[in-house]
Structure formats: structure tokens, C-alpha cells
């Protein structure tokens, strides 16, 4: 569904203390920008902010970078974050940075020294037609870029409603040196206890669509033979 243009969105973001206007200018300097040594987590495609607002408010000791390309949704995310923090009595929003950026060019704004420890990819476009599959946020083309700035032992948490995308994504991760630590074809029936639901997740669940979820771990310079014998926990 196309989001209507909101004339107030860009001016409101420009006045926001936790909005970053020029993300590439901080490439290699995100820890300096947050002004602390806390871990940095990244959400690709933050949408209206329901997920990141709750997650960041729950984890004040973690820094979060939330990326989307549309100012209209980022402005809604900004308001959602402010509302969540206010309701919890948190005076300042110090551990979130919102920004508009093309995720296909994510390596333009993050570098090896940024050491991202976790990436969240929630309900991205499945791009089901073969000519467009390279646009998937879990495609090998993208994973190669993520590996440039992931810390060793970093994780990617991936959720989707799309069976084909999920099945293909498992292959993408395995082909690019990731270990699948956890995988379920029905997250809400799996007993997994660390889930923060997104707006899309709630909508799909109400329609009876099972939510697929995995955690993929990246180990730098890991030899493929090390993967042999690794136990993969899977819930059916």
C-alpha cells in the first residue's frame, strides 16, 4: 500500500535530535557518534517504528540504528519512538538514530570498524520474480555487504510471512558463511521467548499466516569445515 506524501514529514525529521540527515558522513564513526562503547544493532526497514521503539526502550544499554528510505514512514517512526519513551518515563532518547538511506547501498554508511553486533530484517519485500530476487535484503549480494561491517559472532534476526523467501534465505545464509542457530516455520507456536512483534507481524498473525523466523550467526574467517557437527536448533 502506497503511503501518501506528508508535507510535514521532512521538516519534522530535520528538527529531530535523533534523526541523522547524512548517514554516509558517519561511516566508521558510529561509536563516536553515540558517544559510548555500547553494542550497536541495526534494523533494516524500520517502517513506522513499532518494533524499534519497543526494543530500544527495553534495552537502554544498546545503541540502535534504524533505517528506512521513506521520510513519511520515518516521521511516523519518530513519533512512535517519542510516544513509547514518554510513556515509560524515559527523559532522553539517546540510544536510537533514525535515518533515510537506500538499504541496497548500506555499505556506503557502515564500515568494518563500526562492528555491528546484530541486524534485524523484518518482513522485507519478498521480490518473488527471478529477475528481482537480487533485491532481497537476505540475498547473497546483500549478505556480502553486511559482512563488511559485522562483528565476529554477530547475528541476523530475520522474520517473514513468505514461505519462498524464507526457504531461499536459509540457502543464502548458508552459502555465505553464516550458521543457522535457530529456525522455525511458526514463530508464535515455537516457544521462542525474545520476540518483539512488528505491525506487519500482528496483521499477518490475525490472518492466520504463520511467521517464519531464523537467527543466522556470522563468524569472521571461519573455515567451512568448522561448521560440520554444529547443532542447529529447529522448531517445526
From Swiss-Prot:
Family matches, as SUPFAM superfamilies: S-adenosyl-L-methionine-dependent methyltransferases (SSF53335)
Annotated positions binding S-adenosyl-L-methionine: 43, 68, 102, 125
Q: Which gene encodes it?
A: trmB
A Pfam family: Methyltransf_4
Q: What is this protein called?
A: tRNA (guanine-N(7)-)-methyltransferase
Recorded hits in PROSITE patterns, A to Z, give:
SAM_MT_TRMB (PS51625)
User: EC number(s) of the enzyme?
Assistant: 2.1.1.33
Q: Which CDD domains match?
A: AdoMet_MTases (cd02440)
Q: Which residues form a coiled coil?
A: none
Pathway recorded for this protein: tRNA modification; N(7)-methylguanine-tRNA biosynthesis
InterPro entries, per the entry: SAM-dependent_MTases_sf, tRNA_(Gua-N-7)_MeTrfase_Trmb, tRNA_methyltr_TrmB_bact
Query: What keywords were assigned to this record?
Result: Methyltransferase, S-adenosyl-L-methionine, Transferase, tRNA processing
Q: Which family does it belong to?
A: Belongs to the class I-like SAM-binding methyltransferase superfamily. TrmB family.
Q: Which residues are substrate-binding?
A: 129, 161
Q: Report whether DNA damage shows up as a keyword of the record.
A: no
GO cellular component terms, A-Z: tRNA methyltransferase complex
Q: GO molecular function: any one?
A: tRNA (guanine(46)-N7)-methyltransferase activity
Entry keyword Transferase: yes
* General function of this protein: Catalyzes the formation of N(7)-methylguanine at position 46 (m7G46) in tRNA.
Going by the entry's taxonomy, the superkingdom of the source organism is recorded as: Bacteria
